[in-house]
Amino acid sequence: AGDAAAGEDKIGTCVACHGTDGQGLAPIYPNLTGQSATYLESSIKAYRDGQRKGGNAALMTPMAQGLSDEDIADIAAYYSSQE
C-alpha cells in the first residue's frame, strides 16, 4: 500500500488535469477522489507500461512514464484518501 502523505508531494503533474483534490478540472478528466487505491494504481501502471490504449492514453502515458511503482502507489493512496 502506498503512503498518502508521500503521494501528496508527488502529484505535481496530476493536478493540471485532476486538481489537488482529485476532481477532474474538465469533463474529459475523470474524478479520482475516493477511487480504490488498487484501481488507481493498476490504471496508472497500465498507462505507464503502454497497456492501456485509447481514451486519455495519449495524455496519460507520457505523464506516467517517469513514475516508479512506489510513486504510483503513493499517488493512488493520496487520491483514494480524498473526499
Curated annotation (Swiss-Prot):
GO terms for molecular function: electron transfer activity; heme binding; iron ion binding. Binds 1 heme c group covalently per subunit. Gene3D superfamilies: Cytochrome c-like domain. It comes from the Bacteria. PROSITE patterns: CYTC. Pfam families: Cytochrom_C. The keyword Cell membrane does not apply. Keywords: Electron transport, Heme, Iron, Metal-binding, Transport. Heme c binds at residues 14, 17-18, 63. InterPro entries: Cyt_c-like_dom, Cyt_c-like_dom_sf, Cyt_C_IC, Cytochrome_c_Oxidase_Subunit. Homodimer. This is Cytochrome c-554(548). It comes from Halomonas halodenitrificans (strain ATCC 12084 / NCIMB 8669).
